[in-house]
């Protein structure tokens, strides 16, 4: 009797612990949001929010051919706020939107210049949106980017996401997630900088494509201007985000202009100093690389020739950094490089005196740029194959 009683208790407990499926959503009832674009609306205080999503039931598998209908669904709604746009989006689709896989947020230029605080709050506060998704800018409309189909994949969000992943390895543009963007908006010293993407003009025989082209510079929550690709790389040197790109330099006393170096590793130290009562920044950059191309028969088989190349690459890095600083400090006058936070940390008492007027002080900060390059290898051969 005792064993029978225990058996009944176990059965009852097992039944109680079973989970039900009363709130399950079948795959054919879902659409997976992959990207969100936000533009300025036609009327004041309106925004246009574009949602790009995948409809799984229309995707092809080895056992099922693709549907004749596209598996990409793009919807644009005009709304007063981000929350309002979600309500209107639900009215425009017969399926349940899933936001867990959203990778991309694209902001149009007109809206970014007016300020992003109002809708960034709505995105970050709403549970549906991922804070780890990348935030990007475009000079035109974000809706155009998300409606664009690219040759490599029908899903422009996947294509853009892959571009950003690759950029981390080739030192071309900064990567800013929604989370890091919000942290900089909340900072008292550092403003955000965001990668710019664009629809590239079609080349002969090919469709138009999507690519990145420098970055947008913010002052607080407003876009104030753009950096070119070269100026952006100067910024990446300063902020220690350079990754593994390629440097080109000439060789003194020769016609060579295209000796190529693969960046292997680098590090940057931003060191605030006080000289004669004046705050300045010492920017120390160390870079290690390998020769990857030598096109003009330059002999690099001696310590002197290696040193000359190292000096040439150091000069090129310094040029990129100074060009970027000139644009950032003198034209845009906004601290996107983190000098203020470094001064605050090292000289807290002096920082109190300049914090309220940092926007006026930052453009006048003197920056001393020191670069050291170390070439650790010339590749598989020493000299050029061209005599």
What would you call each of these model-derived segments?
Residues 2-387:
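Membrane-proximal alpha-helical signals and transmembrane carboxylates
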């Amino acid at each position: 009797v005792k064993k029978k009683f225990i058996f009944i208790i176990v059965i009852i407990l097992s039944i109680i612990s079973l989970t039900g499926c009363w709130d399950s959503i079948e795959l054919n009832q879902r659409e997976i949001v992959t990207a969100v674009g936000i533009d300025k609306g036609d009327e004041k205080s309106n925004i246009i929010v574009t949602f790009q999503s995948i409809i799984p039931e229309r995707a092809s598998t080895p056992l099922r051919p693709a549907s004749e209908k596209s598996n990409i669904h793009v919807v644009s709604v005009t709304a007063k706020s981000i929350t309002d746009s979600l309500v209107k989006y639900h009215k425009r689709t017969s399926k349940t939107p899933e936001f867990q896989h959203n990778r991309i947020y694209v902001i149009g230029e007109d809206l970014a210049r007016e300020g992003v605080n109002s809708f960034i709050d709505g995105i970050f506060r709403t549970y549906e949106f991922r804070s780890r998704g990348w935030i990007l800018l475009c000079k035109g409309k974000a809706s155009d980017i998300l409606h664009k189909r690219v040759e490599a994949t029908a899903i422009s969000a996947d294509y853009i996401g892959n571009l950003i992943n690759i950029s981390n390895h080739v030192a071309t543009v900064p990567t800013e997630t929604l989370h890091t963007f919000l942290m900089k908006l909340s900072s008292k010293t550092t403003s955000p900088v965001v990668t710019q993407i664009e629809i590239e003009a079609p080349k002969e025989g090919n469709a138009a494509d999507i690519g990145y082209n420098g970055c947008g510079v913010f002052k607080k929550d407003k876009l104030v201007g753009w950096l070119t690709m070269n100026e952006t790389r100067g910024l990446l040197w300063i902020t220690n985000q350079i990754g593994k790109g390629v440097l080109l330099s000439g060789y003194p006393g020769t016609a060579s202009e295209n000796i190529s170096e693969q960046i292997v590793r680098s590090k940057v130290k931003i060191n605030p100093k006080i000289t004669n009562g004046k705050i300045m920044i010492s920017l120390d950059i160390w870079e290690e690389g390998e020769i990857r191309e030598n096109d003009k028969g330059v002999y690099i088989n001696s310590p002197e020739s290696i040193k000359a190349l190292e000096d040439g690459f150091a000069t090129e890095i310094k040029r990129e950094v100074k060009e970027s600083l000139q644009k950032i400090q003198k034209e845009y006058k906004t601290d996107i490089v983190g000098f203020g936070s470094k001064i605050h940390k090292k000289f807290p008492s002096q920082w109190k005196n300049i914090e309220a007027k940092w926007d006026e002080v930052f453009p006048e900060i003197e920056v001393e740029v020191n670069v050291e390059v170390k070439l650790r290898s010339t590749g598989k051969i020493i000299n050029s194959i061209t005599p």
